[in-house]
UniProtKB/Swiss-Prot annotation:
It comes from Finegoldia magna (strain ATCC 29328 / DSM 20472 / WAL 2508). InterPro entries: Ribosomal_bL17 (IPR000456), Ribosomal_bL17_CS (IPR047859), Ribosomal_bL17_sf (IPR036373). Keywords: Ribonucleoprotein, Ribosomal protein. PROSITE patterns: RIBOSOMAL_L17 (PS01167). This is Large ribosomal subunit protein bL17. The keyword DNA damage does not apply. Coiled coil: none annotated. NCBIfam families: L17.
Length: 131
């Protein structure tokens, strides 16, 4: 089995944290986290995008085993995966930010390459209402 970073957590806590990081990445297009967490989340995100590129029913069910929100899986298969149809891996990028102020841990931004998040009509209405 491939080496896995333990991240100072029990197995169930670690897998839940990585699932949440990947889910947030697909919802927002980018997330800010520590470098070690980003490297682990990147592994899982790349696997999920590869499943999204397959696009069949079994791939969708496999993705639902890892990502619990159906709307995030829909976004993955319908919006994110088609962007990477001609790309053979390297769907994410890690941009280092520098040390965190409290404890000096190296922080970074994990983002999807060549993907711009589409704003829904609800988000546009709230932006207009705020102005």
């Amino acid at each position: 089995m491939a080496n896995l970073r333990k991240l100072g957590r029990r197995t169930d806590h670690r897998t839940a944290m990585l699932r949440n990081l990947v889910q947030s990445l697909f919802e927002n297009g980018k997330i800010e986290t520590t470098v070690t967490r980003a490297k682990e989340a990147r592994r899982e995100a790349e696997k999920m995008i590869t499943l999204g590129k397959k696009g069949d029913l079994s791939a969708r069910r496999e993705a639902l085993k890892y990502i619990y929100k159906k709307d995030v899986v829909y976004t993955l298969f319908e919006e994110i995966a088609p962007v990477y149809a001609d790309r053979q891996g390297g769907y994410t990028r890690i941009l280092k930010l520098g040390p965190r102020r409290g404890d000096g841990t190296e922080m970074c931004i994990l983002e999807l390459v060549d993907y711009t998040k589409k704003e829904s009509s609800e988000e546009k209405e709230t932006v207009k209402a705020d102005k």
